[in-house]
Amino acid sequence: DDDQECQPGSLGEFIARSNKMFVGTTGYYNKPEATLELFSNGWIHTGDLGRMDEDGHFFFVDRKKQAIRRRGENISSFEVEAVIAAHDAVLETCVVGVPSELGEEEVKAVIVLKEGHKVSEEELIRWCEPRMAYFAIPRYIAIRDSLPKTPSERVEKFKLKQEGITEDCWDREEAGIQLQR
């Protein structure tokens, strides 16, 4: 957020600049505020978060707007989705941040199972435990028949985020599940 170079391994936003100002774009049509955010201090802010390794290779982590902030930790919805989607019973998933009573957000996973497969929410939590940081493991899980999608089949994350915690959400904390740290 401060246009400073990150250390290898740390999370940061991909930003770029050209030796010719505003090459390729003049900003967002009729959106002056969004254009100001895009072009800040001579840098183009992509809105993508990632890490650079020791060899200078870059790795995408998430869209800045879709990253989840939970108890002081930045969580990539993209990375949590990848772990959950690797489970044999899971067809697709979408992970969003929902409001927390402690401030910031809690992690909610909405999951569609493959036809003929069954898995409990606790089994999914136990699947996640050895594969991701404890703070990224979803607190809420909703198993559904489908995810909301655009005509081009992109998941409409904003709809799942807007709905918040719904009646079909299983709550890991209410279930008394203790995570291994």
Regions found by a protein language model. Name each.
Residues 11:
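Phosphate-recognition beta-domain surfaces
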Residues 1:
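Short gly/Ser/Thr-rich phosphate-binding loop of adenylate-forming enzymes
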Residues 162-181:
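Acidic/polar alpha-helix N-cap and adjacent early helical turns
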Residues 5, 16-21, 26-27, 32-38, ...:
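AMP-binding/adenylate-forming catalytic core of the ANL superfamily
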Residues 42:
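FAD-site-proximal beta/loop scaffold in flavoenzymes
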